[in-house]
């Protein structure tokens, strides 16, 4: 049994390494809420500034992006003598996210564990989770949120231990100051961050802070000073007065019609769908014996899941912090011993399938296609049409700012773009003659509409990026295949088994 566990752990480490650098594309937010904006601005690459960063009330803070992307990539670019490519930047930030979670996440879980047995169980099962292999290595703000939640809990736990052991006052002050700093960074990273700390925070206040007024005052001061600094930086960055992005985000998300644009879900979605999808068959081990009810991990998980379930927009990635927290509360003895091996085998199969699906296949051709196109379009004018793919991250093309025009549903043409995009054909041809690149995102368009657009653009030989499964629905003029990968699967247009054929191609219309 020990040998089997060690073998499985070794295989999970290999999967961690492989999926950390596999270019799957789980959700557009992993690009457009972080690298697209931060690195596009840093390197003056053409990029799309999404609505979160525009207007008089931006809802995304620049400070977490500066910490995660701008600062480290500036150093890397210096070491590369100013020759850093988008491809190298992409692999660096993906590997950085993976390593940060492997090192800092495991360290936090180690320090949160009450015994060697509990630590071994937690690190083993977290290491065997596909969420660790795939989601956590992607550039989601949720990935950062997970680490910040874990380390806030570490500080809370160790503060209470130091109080009972009468440690030096300087350690208590350092704990309070650092906790305040992390709370602000976490909140400005994601407005939902405090929800994970409400229940454990109340316990911390009742058992510790109420008896240590000096630490409470320092915690409040740390929060206030850090918040003031972040607000000042954001205000300067956006050239606005008193830009409080978490407040803007809260006000935006408190409006039902705004949430409706992103999708309205049943308030039980997190509980009955998202948690089982993230945790898999081992969710049955969450029997919650009395000792787990008292743990900070369980309190934090319940706090986050409960309060997030009050909001009608619910996506599985919102619960990423709950995965290591709840795994640490698993009770191996929750099921009869004769069923244990079967449940664990089922869990391994589940995580391998989900890991391969979300970590390798899911929209897995988009990023490699961008890497290919970055070399193909740097020598002249091109028009690239994307169909039935997630929104392509423009920064990966490495095109200088001002030389790329992006046409999609968020373009100033608005919905008219999808109604009569052919009205723009003449303008696209003009840009083509000026040695510019035009990206036309037709993700949700019908095959008939795509046929019309390609036919109108045929004189300038556009490139079409589309899934292999969708080509059968198109009636294209003569073309040649210039690039292809089999590691791509879109799950947004499933219509029978034929639509599940994997693959993404780049075609040049002749």
From Swiss-Prot:
Q: How does it sit in the membrane?
A: Multi-pass membrane protein
A Gene Ontology cellular-component term: endoplasmic reticulum membrane
One GO-annotated biological process of the protein: GPI anchor biosynthetic process
Q: Which UniProt keywords apply?
A: Endoplasmic reticulum, Glycoprotein, Glycosyltransferase, GPI-anchor biosynthesis, Membrane, Transferase, Transmembrane, Transmembrane helix
Q: Name one GO molecular function term.
A: alpha-1,2-mannosyltransferase activity
Q: Which residues cross the membrane?
A: 7-27, 62-82, 89-109, 179-199, 213-233, 268-288, 339-359
Pathway annotation from the record: Glycolipid biosynthesis; glycosylphosphatidylinositol-anchor biosynthesis
Under InterPro entries, the record lists:
GPI_mannosylTrfase
Pfam families tied to this protein: Glyco_transf_22
- Endoplasmic reticulum found in the keyword field: yes
Q: Known EC number(s)?
A: 2.4.1.-
Q: Where does the protein end up?
A: Endoplasmic reticulum membrane
Positions bearing carbohydrate: 142, 212
Query: Family assignment?
Result: Belongs to the glycosyltransferase 22 family. PIGZ subfamily.
Q: What does this protein do?
A: Alpha-1,2-mannosyltransferase involved in glycosylphosphatidylinositol-anchor biosynthesis. Transfers a fourth mannose to trimannosyl-GPIs during GPI precursor assembly. The presence of a fourth mannose in GPI is essential in fungi.
Designated name of the protein: GPI mannosyltransferase 4
The species is Yarrowia lipolytica (strain CLIB 122 / E 150)
Q: Which gene encodes it?
A: SMP3
